[in-house]
Amino acid sequence: MEDKNKTIKETLQGSADAGKRKKLIIKKKGDDPSTPSPAASPKKETVAESAPSSKPPVMPLPLPGDSGQSPIVRPAPSSHSPAKREESPGKQDAGRPPRDKDTRQGGGSSYPPSRSPFQKEDSNIIVSRPIQRTGPSRPNSGGGYQGNRGPGQGGGGYQGNRGPGQGGGGYQGNRGPGPGQGGGGYQGNRGPGQGGGGYQGNRGPRSGGTGTRPMPITSAEVELSQSRGSSVTSKKKGHDKEKSTSDRDFSGAENTKFFKQKFKKTKVVGVSGVSVPKEITLLENVQVGELAKKMNLKPGDVIGKLMKMGMMVTINNIIDAETAALLADEYGCKVKVVSLYEETIIEEEKDNQEDYINRPPVVTIMGHVDHGKTKLLDTIRRSSVIDTESGGITQHIGAYQVRTARGLITFLDTPGHEAFTSMRARGAKVTDIVVLVVAADDGVMPQTLEAISHAKAAEVPILVAINKIDLPAANPEKIMQELANHGLQSEEWGGETMYAKISARENIGIDKLLEMILLQAEVMDLKANPKRRAKGTIIEAKLDPGRGSVATVLIQNGTLRVGDPFVAGVFSGRVRAMYNDLGQLIQEAGPAFPAQVTGIDGVPDAGAPFDAMADEKEARNISQHRIEFERIGNAGAATGTSSKVTLENMNEFIKQGALKELKVIIKADVRGSAEAIKESLEKLSTPEVKLNVIQSGAGAIVDMDVMLASASNALIIGFHVRANPKTIALAEKEGVQIKYYNIIYQVVDEIKLAMEGLLEPEKIEEVIGTAEIREIFKVSKIGNIAGCMVLSGKIQKSANIRVIGDGVTKFEGKLKSLKRVKDDVNDVVAGFECGIQVDGYNDFKVGDTIEAYNVTVIKRKLE
């Protein structure tokens, strides 16, 4: 009640007697009744008919709290009642009776919202506005809704229910049976009476409105409204401004057309309404699910598209970038392909050669089981390492650094040679010198020979330590003789191998052995740069219950400090703490220093590369790329391991310069057969391709043979022997080829054919004709054509040609066209003129010679 002097009028429906009406005038307390209200001139009154005496067929919808009152009558709000917020009738659901709302200052009942189409003059496309009339209300023009109708003249019905008055209104063209006054229709059907009320804005020609519906004033406006499908504005005296008279409808044809234009989709929409990006970045291979995620699409949509392209895939299948680009192109998305392998490579830091200094040698102790390897290391370190080992046999790789009178030496204690080979198979080369321990009382054992083979395959110098010379059965001379038969000739006997006779238990000859190691290191001139970021190799890694992932790292170059971010294999981390081989905390580790490092987010493999990084974020990115690279099946390349050689791909390795010799491992049923095959194959070596038998022996093909072949990039030949399923599975995993034979000459013939394919074929050149350039014709868009006279032989279009001028070969290539006059020909013989166009060459000169020749390729044979 904003205006204190304003009169609130409420239209109330009365009884069936149309002549009896009650006027309800409510004024605020304190107003002078004799003084006219300034807000109403002439005075406005709201006339309502009294409630009908009988209930209508359809039950009214009373509001809560109105019990005991007429369902149509609404009491005027009191002065202390809070003002109700006006709600848009356009927001109400179509087909459902709207709730009564207070739409005018005086309060009153609201009627159903108009169903008329949009009014074009109205700037608001959502909210409908009820008509506010300034003139007196019309008593003879009530319109009902769902059975609620007035009893007076011209009541309008809905759904076939007609009021008892004169001229009841029907539904959808059905007109009331009254005598003609006030029949109301539906959807454009108007009653002929006075003041009929319709539905959706279509009303009879009499001036009278129902509820909040606008109403055309003249018949011309009615026709215009009907033809346009929209309501019109009403102009009244005293009003210069046009008012909107239409509520908004969301189901009309015009509205549908409007919304299609207004909200037309212009983008391809993916999951959750997110648009497909214009460009994405992919690796060479990508999972279907990952592609869908990058394109904001559902995986099912991507799979469906690929099926239409003829590919049966699942969400976990991997497709190449070319296929992904074709699919993305259908969505208007461009694909940028990046190399995943390049993302896994750490850019090498530039070194200053002046910063390089001598570094300690890294020594690996190898030999047969129980020949005294760990005891020797224990004696050197003067500590009790053996007591911590299970049963006195080494169970893990240990790395230790000892200080001697002449300098530091780093020792690797391996369980036999398996770990040594495993690290080499992963591309790691950590050892500078191998110390081969042989028991003086036991002699050369099979594992000793395998250790020799591994060391030679790694191209690492070997020092021999003949242990247990204090025992009565010791025979060092016999050991030296046996080893000389396997290529380890002693310096005392004119060879190049240094021998040391020692007793690890009695500490005999240890100093001489250490002196030999340092002497060999001086010859090798081992250097490193301690001023750069650390670079090394994982020696071993484990999961410690108290410290998490712990890795033993051999620093090969640079210096590692606490807090440095790093990448270890496919994992990343930051150095949380470092320990030396005695378990003491240290702050930094220099070249050739073995350190235990904590702070890794995983357990890397032995032999994995270790690189300190400048930025932790970069370390994580490289780690993620390596994990992705490993996931899609390229783990070998991610850790630096190259592809393995087979008899079928040897030629490719030769062309790439990656293979200069063919390495073979021979296993036979008896040692005599193995030696015979070895001698036969070694005779196939040529200056271009050498055949190297790195190991031969009797017995079945075992896991160690596979690991040696993997580390050496060699083939395995089995003669009358087989590998068990476990070994076969390991060979497949490592990419090692195993060939089986039963006849010796089959072995020799197949290897011979493979090596002949590696030989560079012999090429024989035959000149078939020459021609002299007499004239040059310049043709636009084609190039220069040489007018020639064939002097000897013939010029063939398919032949190779060379252009010779002043005795110098100017160009070699192929003919692009050969013509006689204007005709294309295949050859031109001596004595005839011809036109020659050379592919990729236009610098012809008169007097130059064009020579045609053929090349014959002859396959070479091994002699």
UniProtKB/Swiss-Prot annotation:
Residues 1-251 are annotated as: Disordered. GO terms for molecular function: GTP binding; GTPase activity; translation initiation factor activity. Residues 54-63 have a biased composition (Pro residues). GO terms for cellular component: cytoplasm; cytosol. Residues 224-233 have a biased composition (Polar residues). Residues 413-416 are annotated as: G3. Pfam families: EF-G_D2 (PF22042), GTP_EFTU (PF00009), GTP_EFTU_D2 (PF03144), IF-2 (PF11987), IF2_N (PF04760). Residues 83-104, 239-251 have a biased composition (Basic and acidic residues). Residues 392-396 are annotated as: G2. Residues 503-505 are annotated as: G5. It is found in: Cytoplasm. Belongs to the TRAFAC class translation factor GTPase superfamily. Classic translation factor GTPase family. IF-2 subfamily. This is Translation initiation factor IF-2. It comes from Leptospira interrogans serogroup Icterohaemorrhagiae serovar Lai (strain 56601).
